[in-house]
Amino acid sequence: MSGSTFGLLFCVTNFGESHGPAIGCVIDGCPPGMALGEADIQPDLDRRRPGTSRHVTQRNEPDQVEILSGVYEGRTTGTPICLLIRNTDQRSKDYGNILDTFRPGHADYTYWRKYGLRDPRGGGRSSARMTAPMVAAGAVAKKWLREQHGITFTGWMSALGELPIPFEDESQIPLNPFYAPNAAVVPQLEAYMDALRKSGDSVGARIEVRARGVPAGLGEPLYDKLDADIAYAMMGINAVKGVEIGAGFASVAQRGTQHGDELTPAGFASNNAGGVLGGISTGQDLVVSIAIKPTSSIRSPKASIDRAGAPTVVETLGRHDPCVGIRATPIAEAMLALVVMDHALRQRAQCGDVQLPIPPLAAQAPRTETAPATPPLDAGDDIEA
């Protein structure tokens, strides 16, 4: 009831606060027998962790994961898996000036109105730090999905503020702090962020994420649709203000002759649907895009009120990301993995014995003309990054 648990069969309960002793999660429903150790989880946490470049918060947390339960002799037991990440670099004194005031754009006011009190240290429970346990849980889901179904997840930044990032090469994504699939634009992004940081301002971003190898049939009718759960998961990420699946809002300007993904014996002709029809996966890539708002914690003074309702001016101290989108790629991948994992287990439970006389369609029919090896969107998609 408290909004800290995600999933039905692969169930993740998130706990902790930004400046508490530790954060973590409990995973219930992971199948037994999978080889699992901290080394399987740590790489994704390292991709998300703060202090890795001058363009993100300088809070320097090692984010070393500890497996406290649910694993015996290197294999999952089928019992709850508790993952712990200790906080080591809190600076709570930085928040002394906002004990009685509300930071515009933050959850300070809404938490206070709901609970009658709030933890001002780093945002407490509303901090983006609470995404670290979800990344850890997502790494567990990714491993099972990769081993059982061959499903993989890839995310990248497609826009930083008003700067579009044209897709060029997926191999470039892990080689720069922006997760940009285009090495040529990285110097421009670096200069943009340097100027932004000096001005004391912040900016938003757009992140794309895909799941490849998802079998057809995942998802439920009506209220447990796969795409509905994806949108729910993505909106649970801090600072996300919009979600698109497939062509998304570009569908408004498309005609039916453009948008409908034709089926051929050789496979689907396009993927405007983003891999989901009627709430159920088609066997194509799941194509998701999220919009992330500018960071609310900025050095520039902003008008607000205090707890008595009197006007005041807030200047935010502390260490903050000038663009939270820079570290959002592994978070979006993790949340998508958690949704797919949950639905894979649900499909196995209810429809695992369903057999059909013909094999599933190919995710994409063979191309008839020269095209990039890894386009930003599948043939037929009319949305722009």
Curated annotation (Swiss-Prot):
Top-level taxon in the UniProt lineage: Bacteria
Compositional bias (Low complexity)? 363-372
Listed GO molecular functions? chorismate synthase activity; FMN binding
Q: Gene3D superfamilies from the xrefs?
A: Chorismate synthase AroC
Positions annotated to bind FMN: 125-127, 238-239, 278, 293-297, 319
PROSITE patterns in the cross-refs: CHORISMATE_SYNTHASE_1, CHORISMATE_SYNTHASE_2, CHORISMATE_SYNTHASE_3
The annotated pathway is: Metabolic intermediate biosynthesis; chorismate biosynthesis; chorismate from D-erythrose 4-phosphate and phosphoenolpyruvate: step 7/7
Instruction: Give the EC number(s) listed in the UniProt record.
Output: 4.2.3.5
Its GO CC terms are:
cytosol
Q: Which GO terms describe its biological process?
A: amino acid biosynthetic process; aromatic amino acid family biosynthetic process; chorismate biosynthetic process
Tell me the cofactors it needs.
FMNH2
Where are the annotated segments for Disordered?
Answer: 43-63, 363-385
Q: Which keywords accompany this UniProt record? A: Amino-acid biosynthesis, Aromatic amino acid biosynthesis, FAD, Flavoprotein, FMN, Lyase, NADP
Give the co-factor note: Reduced FMN (FMNH(2)).
User: At which positions is NADP(+) bound?
Assistant: 48, 54
Q: Which SUPFAM superfamilies match?
A: Chorismate synthase, AroC (SSF103263)
Q: How does it assemble?
A: Homotetramer.
Q: Which family does it belong to?
A: Belongs to the chorismate synthase family.
Q: Please report the name of this protein according to its UniProt entry.
A: Chorismate synthase
What's the source species for this entry?
Leptothrix cholodnii (strain ATCC 51168 / LMG 8142 / SP-6) (Leptothrix discophora (strain SP-6))
Q: State the encoding gene.
A: aroC
